[in-house]
């Protein structure tokens, strides 16, 4: 079976041998050649590891995949897609992924202690509000995390676990057990939209959640994928229908309240391999970010065909994107 490495999520793990060796593990979202076109393949999630964050060795079999199990009705024939993984302080890994049966995408959750053997728990909104959101299309989850020394771990806020999620808008959900989640609603009993697409900006079509959100001194940082709309409603500085990466900051006391948002992307398709493949309009689709060896490694999908990495060194920042430097100019 031919696999195309696609989108990834990452996590750190320490391994004791003759000394402590820090390994970087990634979960690779791969698609086979059973179908033609985006959305018609069968997706599986694999496992790879690295000692430098750049060169990876992966095992030959998937670790999370559509099987003959309790989730078959949600995952056959489309599979398991778009993984986002984080870890609790006691070492339990939690993965949120899209269960795709080619009819309706649903956010699913699974847990593991070794990143290899996963226990599926099913759709995360199945029990919420008596199943109100069970048959609604849901995907793309970014759980709230914090830094514990140099390790990024799942965090609570106001006594609850917090999750940003959504593709067309950014929504939120809370949980007490990491498995059963309750969407945050507005006073009218509908999903509360935290941020939405903006006319004339790089995220004019979609604002899709990406890696786990991170508590910082200034607020909660959520990096997300923005899709540029074609025509007059999009940002003419970027290709129509292209995917770029944005940032939004939420209030620490009220995690549903945005307090700052970039008007231009901090990562955009520029290289040839980011503009060729299954999605030729240009795609840098971020899904995994980790603090590794005192640097931030951001892993992203290149045109739905390859996996790339961008590295930020806080001690030696690189040159800013010229679009950001000139962001005050007319569009």
Region annotations inferred by a language model:
Residues 1-15, 19-78, 87-205, 215-279, ...:
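Beta-rich carbohydrate-recognition and catalytic domains
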Residues 81:
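Acidic-residue sensor for enzyme active/binding pockets
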Residues 203-209, 282-285:
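Donor nucleotide-activated moiety binding/catalytic core segment of transferases
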Residues 212:
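Active-site/ligand-binding surface loops and adjacent short beta/alpha elements
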Residues 274-276, 284-287:
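Short glycine-rich, acidic/polar surface loops and turns
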